[in-house]
Design a protein with these regions (language model features):
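Surface-exposed acidic/polar loop and edge beta-strand patches at domain peripheries
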Residues: 6-185, 189, 193-253, 257-384
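C-terminal motif of bacterial Sec signal peptides marking the signal peptidase cleavage site
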Residues: 2-4
């Protein structure tokens, strides 16, 4: 479960460097790894069972998760959000609207009033069990939404390393021996432990999974979508309209530039979404695939827009975010891939579960093309 690095200092950008750093800043971190020692992930129980980073090539391999080293070193919480980073974190929705848990009752929907609940920002999850390939966490929470409804819930979060056969079966592929890969799955559950039902009157929560990944000049997010569905292909006005040179769609695939040079966000509705989103970093030749639960026929997704909403259940199923300078400041060189569960319409004692899987592939371009064609319908050469 715990891994040691080589005696020589590791280079920044490698998994070994991040492991050494996190062993100092994050007591109790866990390392899951496969039998070869090449595929590894780091998990922090102190940060909600967050997957901090991963690698496909051992300690000297590329580290895929974005980390906020300065903030992690101090371990200080900050107003609004403590942006520690991490490759996959557990959040709850909705962010905005009358059912929001990020704004207090009666407040204006402005950044000054926006606050991530401490339970999903800086508090620890309880470690239930851990092996070389899986770790299980739990947390009791009490949150209040914008209309004043108190919501009590129990959270279960299981993190599992995926093997080659898991990935072959999941994606319907046959991985070449020349391809290095790391993949993990999180099973995230919320149970209504209160005395009132979660519904359209009292409000509902959703499970919201977000991945912070290292951006580059040549990274492109790609998302397939249903071409025959009704409604806009995507929502792109979260932070103002995304320029055409940064966002386009063609032949059933959305292309969204992820260079951390322009703050922007897109969302895809459940009627348009498919259960995949990913990215390709042409500089490092890394293909990333995220696969998640997308229940057919369920169109009730919480709406995260910062306003009182006409329809608080008309939100997105999948999102992508590109960081950039905002008011002269920037969080870091990262982008995000996000998925959400449907709105949790739960009577007391009932549970909703959402799975999210992240897989990184490195190898010869012809092998990456085979994976990309199978999942996204296009070769990696077109992801630009």
């Amino acid at each position: 479960m715990f891994s040691s690095c080589t005696n020589t200092p590791s280079t920044k950008g490698t998994f070994g460097f991040d492991l050494e750093f996190l062993q100092k800043s994050e007591p109790g971190i866990l390392v899951l790894e496969d039998a070869s020692g090449d595929a590894k992930i780091i998990i922090s129980p102190n940060l909600q069972g967050r997957v901090m980073t991963s690698t496909a090539e051992g300690d000297q391999g590329t580290s895929f998760g974005w980390l906020n080293y300065d903030l992690l070193a101090t371990r200080k919480t900050t107003k609004h959000m403590t942006a520690f980073g991490g490759e996959e974190r557990f959040w709850l929705g909705p962010e905005g609207g009358q059912f929001s848990i990020y704004f207090k009752k009666g407040q204006d929907f402005t950044f000054e009033n926006w606050q991530v609940p401490k339970e999903i920002d800086s508090e620890a999850f309880q470690l239930v069990s851990a092996t070389k390939s899986e770790a299980k966490f739990t947390k009791e929470m009490h949150v209040e939404n914008y209309i004043g409804t108190a919501l009590d819930l129990h959270v279960d979060r299981d993190v599992r390393l995926l093997g080659k056969e898991n990935i072959n079966q999941l994606l319907g592929i046959n991985l070449s021996k020349d391809v290095k890969m790391v993949g993990f799955e999180t099973a995230n559950s919320i149970t209504n432990t209160g005395k009132i039902p979660w519904n359209k009157t009292n409000g509902m929560l959703s499970i919201w999974i977000l991945s912070m990944l290292n951006a580059s000049e040549k990274t492109m997010v790609v998302a397939p979508f249903k071409q025959d569905a009704e409604g806009p292909v995507y929502t792109d006005d979260y932070f103002g309209k995304v320029p055409a040179d940064r966002l386009r769609h063609e032949n059933g695939v959305i292309f969204f530039k992820a260079d951390a040079k322009y703050r922007s966000k897109i969302g895809i509705s459940p009627s348009r979404a498919l259960p995949f989103i990913g990215s390709y970093d042409a500089e490092k030749q890394v293909l990333t695939v995220a696969q998640f639960d997308l229940p057919g026929g369920n169109s009730q997704y919480v709406n995260g827009k910062w306003e009182l909403q006409k329809d608080p259940l008309s939100g997105d199923a999948v999102n992508a975010y590109n960081d950039g300078v905002n008011n002269g400041n920037q969080l870091g060189k990262f982008y995000e891939i996000e998925s959400s569960s449907p709105a949790a319409e739960l009577d007391p004692g009932k549970t909703l579960t959402h799975h999210h899987r992240t897989i990184h592939f490195m190898g010869p371009k012809q092998d990456l093309n085979q994976i990309s064609l199978k999942v996204f319908g296009i070769p990696v050469d077109q992801m630009k």
